[in-house]
Amino acid sequence: MVAAALRAASDAPGYPLTAGTPQLRASIGAWLSRRLGVRGLDPDAVLPTIGSKELVGLLPTLLGLGPGDRVVHPEVAYPTYDIGARIAGAEPVPADGLTALGPGPVGLIWVNSPANPTGRVLPVEHLRKVVEWARVRGTVVASDECYIELGWDEQPVSILHPDVCGDSHTGLLAVHSLSKRSNLAGYRAGFVAGDPDLVSRLLTIRRHAGLMVPAPVQAAMTAAYGDDSHVIEQRERYAARRTVLLAALRAYGLRVEHSTAGLYLWATGDEDCWLTVAGLAASGVLVGPGEFYGRAGRRHVRLALTATDERVAAAAARLTAVPTLD
């Protein structure tokens, strides 16, 4: 269905609309309402992006941040939040609590729920406090919600949900991607939505920078956000892999923390992550060292649910065939 939409729109020699087609913006708006409970979103407050990673990496720059500005991100986090701040010349600040930020100004706060790599879900109350804190100070809050349709033991909530932000999207940006929910990483298809004034600023700069999503990809996005059945099917596959890997990791002797949503299992053997990486590698299982995601992750490893069913089953068999850590 998505590939068919891409093919049907492939004869597109002209420049695409940086703002996105009206059909795409309508499809995204309907999805945000239908799946995430977002209300009152301005149709012009939706902007397609070339995947979500380029937006994450460029957002501080696009917002005009630079030397002397602070960009806050989770202590254990996707590295591009840090890199994006550095690209702009701003200061990246890893912090999980608002009190640690002190009285100085903050230009941008990143939240990520469900989180990569931890799979942690932030409760509504926490998100609401972040929004209230930021609005008092004129700080932009950007919420990376790429895994939001992959809730397992907890259901994530969007920063744009009225329980979080009330009746206003002022100061808020939600970032989304088709890479995870629709398994379309190769299409480089995502969007940002929220505060219409902020989105308008981003649109103006992106037009001049040539940051536009190709027309065939916009057509594919329109189809993907209009269909829920393929997402449900993909969720079922991830859920089955998660069940298999959870049991295998526990049998091996690792403790799985958070991991209540998203595509990853965040595990620890209560030792330096590189020792855990080496032990698992000796069994033929490759994992990501938690240190890659910040100093606070140096005793954890990340396992992804993105391998094929056959590879996940093989990894589980290897984990349960070796002596445990206990």
Please annotate each region the language model reported:
Residues 1-6, 34-326:
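PLP-dependent class I/II
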Residues 7-26, 33-35:
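A glycine-/small-polar-enriched, mobile loop at the entrance of the PLP active site in fold-type I
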